């Protein structure tokens, strides 16, 4: 099963369009988590205390942990997150908070080193930007979590930038990015 994390707020999202091109190459069943419907709230004092209590009791089946369980069980993960303010929408950060759960998506060894517990071996981060992508901090953050915590071996970024620059040939830019999807492969 491929998990599609749709962090695109806009109905007509170019990031989602590019992500769909990635999904079309995979040929697997897809479960979608969308920022516009089923999405975790940012951690609060209360939800963090509940999560800590659940983990202390070993109650990993609680609904609060469903996003982490789903993420850990996925065979492949595709995330669509537009490039906003040098990162991605705040809701995407809330999603990462919900899935970064010790005992479900990673564990610490006796030296405090995290080790991944996720089934997925591939994570594809898809992003688009109206201007140039400077630093790609959103991808860097996702990549650090995937490699450093979740144990996901292959992490790649598919992007299209300059889409809102006056005179930009948006269809051509997106078509070029889509060509890169096939050549990048898994």
Predicted regions and their residues:
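Short histidine/acidic/glycine/proline-rich micro-motifs that form metal-
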Residues: 9-12, 130-133, 163-165
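Conserved nucleotide-sugar donor-interacting segment of glycosyltransferase catalytic cores
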Residues: 101-111
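Short, glycine-/small-residue-rich phosphate/pyrophosphate-handling segment
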Residues: 109-150
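Structured loop/turn residues at beta-strand edges in well-structured enzyme cores
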Residues: 72, 90, 118, 150-153
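N-terminal beta1-alpha1-beta2 submodule of the flavodoxin-like/Rossmannoid cofactor-binding fold
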Residues: 1-101, 179-186
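Short, well-ordered alpha-helical segments in soluble proteins
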Residues: 96-99, 103, 127, 150
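Glycine-rich phosphate/pyrophosphate-binding loop and the adjoining helix
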Residues: 140-186
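Cofactor-binding loop segments of dinucleotide-utilizing enzymes, especially the Rossmann-like FAD-
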Residues: 7, 35, 127-128, 160
């Amino acid at each position: 099963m491929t998990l599609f994390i749709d962090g695109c707020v806009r109905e007509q999202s170019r990031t989602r369009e590019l992500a769909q091109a990635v999904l079309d190459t995979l040929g697997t069943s897809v479960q979608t988590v969308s920022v516009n419907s089923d999405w975790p709230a940012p951690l609060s004092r209360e939800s963090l205390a509940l999560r800590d209590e659940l983990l202390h009791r070993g109650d990993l089946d609680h609904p609060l942990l469903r996003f982490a369980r789903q993420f850990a069980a996925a065979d492949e993960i595709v995330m669509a997150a537009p490039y906003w303010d040098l990162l991605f929408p705040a809701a995407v950060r809330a999603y990462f908070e919900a899935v970064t759960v010790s005992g479900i998506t990673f564990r610490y060894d006796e030296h405090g080193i995290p080790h991944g517990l996720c089934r997925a071996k591939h994570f594809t981060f898809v992003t688009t930007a109206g201007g140039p992508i400077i630093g790609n901090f959103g991808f860097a953050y996702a990549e650090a979590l995937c490699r450093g915590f979740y144990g996901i071996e292959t992490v790649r970024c598919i992007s299209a930038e300059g889409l809102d620059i006056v005179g930009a040939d948006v269809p051509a830019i997106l078509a070029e990015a889509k060509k890169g999807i096939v050549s990048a492969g898994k």
